[in-house]
């Protein structure tokens, strides 16, 4: 599975795809990696990273959602962000060669309710592109308190016909991925476009569908250091979880 994720740009509406991670203490996030497919001429413009908390944080709970559920989704609005255009993020790319996936969520493939039949489409089918690993350095680190978050990377492809598609990873997490700490659940990947916002859809449960519906994680890692809390004499233990160690190539779904 691969899901589109891009900032808005000339002739292209915004699409966001997110997967979750947990911090058990105040943490400075200094870098990240993620992997996806580039289509078109694979020329990268802006790279943006957003952090969301879990609904109902940062959300309007009085409105009626236009999706089957908001439980365990990202919030309505982002908690924090960094982007290369603002100079608080820089990045390098590594070309991993051509790759294909059996299913995808492409621009125009995200639909809200009424339900049924929307939003279930079964996905938008197979996709081939240049597999690229992104190494991102946050020149202004994210300083995040203990909480459950979603990581949302977006890549602008300057070719009008091109896009970035974030690759999936197994769910439940398998080695060398980092398991979630006790008391926290590994949530599945979610996505939305600017027409669906502020709502989100589950990539597997809502868009692909089926009985049972598949669930997906995404390929990413985060690097950070614990930050002393005020009046604390020792560093808190850092638990950076999610797909923190998933950096190897695999046969994608």
Where are these regions (language model features)?
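Aromatic- and Gly/Pro-enriched, solvent-exposed loop/edge beta-strand patches characteristic
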Residues: 38-181
